[in-house]
Amino acid sequence: MTIMRKSHPLMKIVNHAFVDLPTPPNISGWWNFGSLLGLCLILQILTGLFLAMHYTSDTLTAFASVTHICREVNYGWLIRYMHANGASLFFICLYIHIGRGIYYGSYLYKETWNIGILLLFMTMATAFVGYVLPWGQMSFWGATVITNLLSAIPYIGQDLVEWIWGGFSVDKATLTRFFAFHFILPFIITALVLVHLLFLHETGSNNPLGIPSDCGKVPFHPYYTTKDFLGVILLIMLFMTLVLFFPDKLGDPDNYTPANPLNTPPHIKPEWYFLFAYAILRSIPNKLGGVIALVSSIMVLALLPYLHTSKQRSLSFRPLSQTLFWMLISDLIILTWIGGQPVESPYIIIGQVASILYFSIILIFMPIAGLVENKMLKW
């Protein structure tokens, strides 16, 4: 008699995805972040569900309801801080996952990569609308500034902004619909994750060498379930250290002040994981130009499969491209720092140079480096 996991229609799907999945024998710890992202998503949905039971999406009571959760709900403070810091953890894993994809040439699986970019956009949208919900100063002004960017779209811009607001300013209607979006988007993300995995399992995983490994593949369980479990333990340790010892380290103190449309904070800025894109947006002294640059900073990832000029897939044996990759990472760290600084000299010029460098490395230098390396290897 065949084993149930191999014969039952539902269990067969799970079996092919997590148990008998043929996996390259040499994938490193950088491949752990896919499963860690799955864990983060489950964590966010569960903590978010419990928060939604006590939260009220009304401008008069939203801030008070968050205070109520922290003070009067059993372990409400823990659920709230797990959810808030869980978002930061989600983006840390997400950026490492994308970085690994760039380094090892995983973007050549075009369908998987494009679904991944769509997932990044959806996650950013979810995090943005979620940041508005506590209805603190930075929530209100962040929502006002970022949604206002849509008014730069020619002809329909202003109508679009007022349609999203549900009025002539960010108010009760905006908060209510943002709560609805924040509740539904994670489930859409979950569906997209399944599509992401579906496309990935069509081709099989890439590996650090960037060469086919069909002849030496091993089953996912027990080898990689064990390996992923180590990553899970380390992640939970890091996460709980952050939540229990430094719960407000990554937040903004301004968000502990209730939203006031008559009082603008001195520095309006998004959460740390959006600062690199915010710096690129601010580096162009034109509203429409800034919005185009902001969208392009993510959409440029979709061009990577078409800009791949090297005969090798991975950067493992390409020192020139490796140098450019780490320059790109350093540049993103500089952009993140600049995004949190006021708009004044010397930050303006540093931000502009870093923004130009970001696009130049991806669009110009990396494809050229690939061609040079081919030439050096006489390929």
Curated annotation (Swiss-Prot):
Listed InterPro entries: Cyt_b/b6_C, Cyt_b/b6_C_sf, Cyt_b/b6_N, Cytb/b6-like_sf, Cytochrome_b, Cytochrome_b_C_euk/bac, Cytochrome_b_N_euk/bac, Di-haem_cyt_TM
Transmembrane listed as a keyword: yes
Cofactor: heme b
Note accompanying the cofactor annotation: Binds 2 heme b groups non-covalently.
BP GO terms, sorted: mitochondrial electron transport, ubiquinol to cytochrome c
Predominant localisation class: mitochondrion
Entry binding sites for a ubiquinone: 201
Record membrane topology: Multi-pass membrane protein
Protein residues bound to heme b b566: 97, 196
Compartments where found: Mitochondrion inner membrane
Residues binding heme b b562, per UniProt: 83, 182
One Gene Ontology MF term: ubiquinol-cytochrome-c reductase activity
Further comment: Heme 1 (or BL or b562) is low-potential and absorbs at about 562 nm, and heme 2 (or BH or b566) is high-potential and absorbs at about 566 nm.
Protein family: Belongs to the cytochrome b family.
Biological role stated in the UniProt entry: Component of the ubiquinol-cytochrome c reductase complex (complex III or cytochrome b-c1 complex) that is part of the mitochondrial respiratory chain. The b-c1 complex mediates electron transfer from ubiquinol to cytochrome c. Contributes to the generation of a proton gradient across the mitochondrial membrane that is then used for ATP synthesis.
Self-association and partners: The cytochrome bc1 complex contains 11 subunits: 3 respiratory subunits (MT-CYB, CYC1 and UQCRFS1), 2 core proteins (UQCRC1 and UQCRC2) and 6 low-molecular weight proteins (UQCRH/QCR6, UQCRB/QCR7, UQCRQ/QCR8, UQCR10/QCR9, UQCR11/QCR10 and a cleavage product of UQCRFS1). This cytochrome bc1 complex then forms a dimer.
Protein name: Cytochrome b
Gene: MT-CYB
